[in-house]
């Protein structure tokens, strides 16, 4: 009995003790590390993780490492090193780590966002990009879809003229419908039960992922009861049940002659692989219902809360800077007026608005730390060796708040993106990657940029958004989960008198 116990202890120690690194190789500086727990006891336990990692950078340098349990993670906070990881050696660092909570969310790394590098990820990313190509022209043009939903949003807000409201739900509905039209060619109305399901599981998943989950560091803990994991499983179950119902209806009505949305593209790809026989058997397995559902879930997860969050952050900063709000309205009045609504063709004229959006994406990046990458082979970052299987995290917050790259980085200054004459947009620093870069970059970047620009241009043209009568300004600290969320806040919505008069004049 004792011999067996000693053997088991030695076996555990062997597998959990840090393995010897390549002799002679130079590795990044590391936080102190203990057997079994790694650097866990030496990492700050309070505050925002991205800020804590940024502070550690001042002690350990722009690239350093730490261990969580048995896994080594390299933290990168320099734009040149970040681009080496994401672009120059993008394929070498294109993997995703296995994490218990993310494996639940992605059904063991299916889909796009959390899938490891391989045939499945490549196929689904390619098909998602093919879907966006469907929306380049005609009535299905992406801009038309976005503007239709923004028009409905503005009508909704106009009915609440003079009231103080939280913009989250109206924005969530509009952005969700844009994604729904891309994915299913359908949309929801306010109060639709399905919309409530999406909202609930979306918020639940973000809250769950935002918690410190020890089970992600010590996977063996998943054998014990875990409320967080049970909640995550329930949210994913609700998501998949809703999406499966939509998928089944889509299969019934599918026509190979009418490919108009992402589900059509995915179903068509599976049918083509089924018809090609044994040669495409592997492709068919990678296009199972579970794979399709996870990919659609990824598009929702990446496309809804992110855009909604950026628009809300932009409004929040403008409430703190009312003079800038007026300047933005003046820019729109001078270049567009009130006889028509803003379009993407106005983007080159509305340079102050574009500079403001860029500054919001800098000072409050959608994801302060990018989704972790994983080295799929032995590689290097700068002068440092990185072993296969090492996790690599890009601290986007560090890139966007580096005092050597940005003047007064903690201050909201849209003018930093304008030349001295305030007549042209500029790139003041290369340390700016709001959507990542390389093969793992955000595939919805173009959609997100269009959405944020058009949402803000329409809102500025039609409404005065003001601080509520109680004088409560939005808190700008935020809550970092997978997405950097702003705390709920209210804004007083007032239809602009100039807009009202122009509409009355146009109707006579």
UniProtKB/Swiss-Prot annotation:
Sequence positions that bind substrate? 202
Among Pfam families, the record links this protein to: p450
| Principal place of residence | endoplasmic reticulum
Q: Which InterPro entries match?
A: Cyt_P450, Cyt_P450_CS, Cyt_P450_E_grp-I, Cyt_P450_sf
Provide the residue positions that the database annotates as binding heme.
442
Q: How is its activity regulated?
A: Regulated predominantly by intracellular cAMP levels. The 17,20-lyase activity is stimulated by cytochrome b5, which acts as an allosteric effector increasing the Vmax of the lyase activity.
Q: Which Gene3D superfamilies match?
A: Cytochrome P450 (1.10.630.10)
Can you supply a Gene Ontology BP term from the record?
glucocorticoid biosynthetic process
Gene behind this chain? CYP17A1
Q: Name one GO cellular component term.
A: endoplasmic reticulum membrane
| EC number of this enzyme | 1.14.14.19, 1.14.14.32
Keyword Lipid metabolism: yes or no? yes
Its catalytic activity? a C21-steroid + reduced [NADPH--hemoprotein reductase] + O2 = a 17alpha-hydroxy-C21-steroid + oxidized [NADPH--hemoprotein reductase] + H2O + H(+); progesterone + reduced [NADPH--hemoprotein reductase] + O2 = 17alpha-hydroxyprogesterone + oxidized [NADPH--hemoprotein reductase] + H2O + H(+); pregnenolone + reduced [NADPH--hemoprotein reductase] + O2 = 17alpha-hydroxypregnenolone + oxidized [NADPH--hemoprotein reductase] + H2O + H(+); 17alpha-hydroxyprogesterone + reduced [NADPH--hemoprotein reductase] + O2 = androst-4-ene-3,17-dione + acetate + oxidized [NADPH--hemoprotein reductase] + H2O + 2 H(+)
**Where is it localised?**
Endoplasmic reticulum membrane; Microsome membrane
Mind telling me which SUPFAM superfamilies this protein's record contains?
Cytochrome P450 (SSF48264)
* Record's protein name: Steroid 17-alpha-hydroxylase/17,20 lyase
Q: Which UniProt keywords apply?
A: Endoplasmic reticulum, Heme, Iron, Lipid metabolism, Lyase, Membrane, Metal-binding, Microsome, Monooxygenase, Oxidoreductase, Steroidogenesis
Q: Which domain of life is it from?
A: Eukaryota
**Member of which family?**
Belongs to the cytochrome P450 family.
Which pathway does the protein contribute to?
Steroid hormone biosynthesis; Steroid biosynthesis; glucocorticoid biosynthesis
Q: What is this protein for, i.e. what is its function? A: A cytochrome P450 monooxygenase involved in corticoid and androgen biosynthesis. Catalyzes 17-alpha hydroxylation of C21 steroids, which is common for both pathways. A second oxidative step, required only for androgen synthesis, involves an acyl-carbon cleavage. The 17-alpha hydroxy intermediates, as part of adrenal glucocorticoids biosynthesis pathway, are precursors of cortisol.
Q: Name one GO molecular function term.
A: iron ion binding
Q: Which cofactor does it need?
A: heme
């Amino acid at each position: 009995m004792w011999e067996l116990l000693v053997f088991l202890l030695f076996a555990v120690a062997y597998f959990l003790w840090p393995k010897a690194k390549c002799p002679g190789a130079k590795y990044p500086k590391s936080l102190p590390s203990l057997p079994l727990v790694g650097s866990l006891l030496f990492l700050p336990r309070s505050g925002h993780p991205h800020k804590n990692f940024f502070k550690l950078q001042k002690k350990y340098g722009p690239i350093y490492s730490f261990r969580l349990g048995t896994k080594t993670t390299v933290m990168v906070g320099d734009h040149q090193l970040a681009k080496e990881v994401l672009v120059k050696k993008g394929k070498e660092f294109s993997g995703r780590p296995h994490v218990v909570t993310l494996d639940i969310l992605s059904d063991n790394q299916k889909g796009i966002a959390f899938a490891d590098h391989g045939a499945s990820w490549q196929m689904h990313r390619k098909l998602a990009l093919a879907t966006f190509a469907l929306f380049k022209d005609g009535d299905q043009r992406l801009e038309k879809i976005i503007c239709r939903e923004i028009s409905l949003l503005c009508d909704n807000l106009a009915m609440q003229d003079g009231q103080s409201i939280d913009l989250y739900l109206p924005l969530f509905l509009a952005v969700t419908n844009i994604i729904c039209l891309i994915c299913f060619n359908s949309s929801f109305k306010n109060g639709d039960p399905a919309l409530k399901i999406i909202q609930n599981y979306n918020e639940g998943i973000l809250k769950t992922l935002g918690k410190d989950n020890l089970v992600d560091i010590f996977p063996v803990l998943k054998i014990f009861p875990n409320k967080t994991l049970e909640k995550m499983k329930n949210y994913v179950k609700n998501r998949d049940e809703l999406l499966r119902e939509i998928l089944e209806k889509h299969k019934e009505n599918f026509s190979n002659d009418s490919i108009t949305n992402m589900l059509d593209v995915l179903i068509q790809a599976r049918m083509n692989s089924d018809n090609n026989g044994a040669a495409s058997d592997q492709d068919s397995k990678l296009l199972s219902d579970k794979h399709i559902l996870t990919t659609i879930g990824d598009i929702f997860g990446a496309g809804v809360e992110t855009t909604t969050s950026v628009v809300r952050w932009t409004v929040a900063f403008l409430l703190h800077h009312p003079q800038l709000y007026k300047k933005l309205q003046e820019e729109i009045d001078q270049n567009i007026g009130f006889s028509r609504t803003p379009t993407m063709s106005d983007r080159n004229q509305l340079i102050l608005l574009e500079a403001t959006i860029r500054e919001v994406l800098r000072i409050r990046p959608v994801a302060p730390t990018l989704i972790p990458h994983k080295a799929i082979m032995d590689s290097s970052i700068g002068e440092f060796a990185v072993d296969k299987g090492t996790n690599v995290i890009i601290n986007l917050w560090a890139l966007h708040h580096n005092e050597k790259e940005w003047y007064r980085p903690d201050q909201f200054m849209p003018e930093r993106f304008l030349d001295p004459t305030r007549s042209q947009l500029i790139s003041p620093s290369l340390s700016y990657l709001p959507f990542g870069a390389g093969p793992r970059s955000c595939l919805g970047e173009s959609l997100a940029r269009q959405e944020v620009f058009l949402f803000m241009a329409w809102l500025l043209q039609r409404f005065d958004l003001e601080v509520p009568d109680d004088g409560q300004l939005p808190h700008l600290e935020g809550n970092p989960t997978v997405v950097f969320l702003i705390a709920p806040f209210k804004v007083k919505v007032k239809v602009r008198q100039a807009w009202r008069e122009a509409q009355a004049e146009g109707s006579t």
